[in-house]
Amino acid sequence: MHIDWWTLGLQAINVLILIWILSRFLFKPVAAIVEARRASIARLLDEAHATRVAAEAEREKARQEVTSLATARAAALQKAEDEAKAETETILANARSEAGKLREAAKADIARARQDEAAAMADHASQLAVDIAGKLLSRLPEEARISGFIEGLAQGLAALPEAIRTNIGATDAPVQLKAARALTEAETQACRVRLSEALGHPAEIAVDVRPELIAGLEIDMPHAVVRNSFRADLTRITAALIQTGSMQTGQEAPRPETP
């Protein structure tokens, strides 16, 4: 085989020139294009990654906002429920208090009405009893209005403690004796004798005429009260009647005035 070195050399030179030309006008531009495309792809990838990161951040922010809104809504609903419950309790408490006040006021009104009715009945009964007693006594002898009450008054006086009886009439001041009418000399003497016996020492009396007693005698002093009269009996009877009526209605009876 014969090798033509000049031809081979020329071909080698052609190859080198071709390689230079390709490198100059093909490989470098293509490499530049590839590098530019790679850089563009890398940039796009970076932008996509940044966009994805931003999207993830926005989604997390939105999730947090939704959670915050849900928490705030739940808190607002709970607060509204608590306020409504407290307001309801306040309204109910005020209503119960007002109802209690109305009940107490109604009870007080009923009690006052019953007491007024009982007092009116007591006054009517007392006046009726006085009228009846007056009519009955008008048929009796005048001496019966006094003589029949001397012994009972003396017994009541004798029942007082000794210390009190000792002080009654012990000074020069006479014992104040209330009588339904003026006493005769005999009645005055009978009262003086019997009361002195009950007291255990002599005592003078001063008669104070009180027609409202109807019949009977009374001794009314700051430290001792002894009553034996129709008026006192009527007062006790009226009080007993009122007390009985009040017990039936469950109310406290008004106390009648003592004559």
From Swiss-Prot:
Transmembrane segments: 5-27
Keyword S-adenosyl-L-methionine: no
InterPro entries for this protein: ATP_synth_b/b'su_bac/chlpt, ATP_synthase_B_chain
One MF term in the entry's GO annotations: proton-transporting ATPase activity, rotational mechanism
Keywords: ATP synthesis, Cell inner membrane, Cell membrane, CF(0), Hydrogen ion transport, Ion transport, Membrane, Transmembrane, Transmembrane helix, Transport
Gene Ontology cellular component annotations, sorted alphabetically: plasma membrane; proton-transporting ATP synthase complex
Lineage: Bacteria, Pseudomonadati, Pseudomonadota, Alphaproteobacteria, Hyphomicrobiales
Domain of life of the source: Bacteria
Species: Beijerinckia indica subsp. indica (strain ATCC 9039 / DSM 1715 / NCIMB 8712)
Family per record: Belongs to the ATPase B chain family.
Family matches, as Pfam families: ATP-synt_B
Function summary: F(1)F(0) ATP synthase produces ATP from ADP in the presence of a proton or sodium gradient. F-type ATPases consist of two structural domains, F(1) containing the extramembraneous catalytic core and F(0) containing the membrane proton channel, linked together by a central stalk and a peripheral stalk. During catalysis, ATP synthesis in the catalytic domain of F(1) is coupled via a rotary mechanism of the central stalk subunits to proton translocation.
Subcellular localization, as worded in the UniProt entry: Cell inner membrane
Membrane protein topology class: Single-pass membrane protein
Quaternary data: F-type ATPases have 2 components, F(1) - the catalytic core - and F(0) - the membrane proton channel. F(1) has five subunits: alpha(3), beta(3), gamma(1), delta(1), epsilon(1). F(0) has three main subunits: a(1), b(2) and c(10-14). The alpha and beta chains form an alternating ring which encloses part of the gamma chain. F(1) is attached to F(0) by a central stalk formed by the gamma and epsilon chains, while a peripheral stalk is formed by the delta and b chains.
The keyword Membrane is annotated on this UniProt entry: yes
Protein name from the UniProt record: ATP synthase subunit b 3
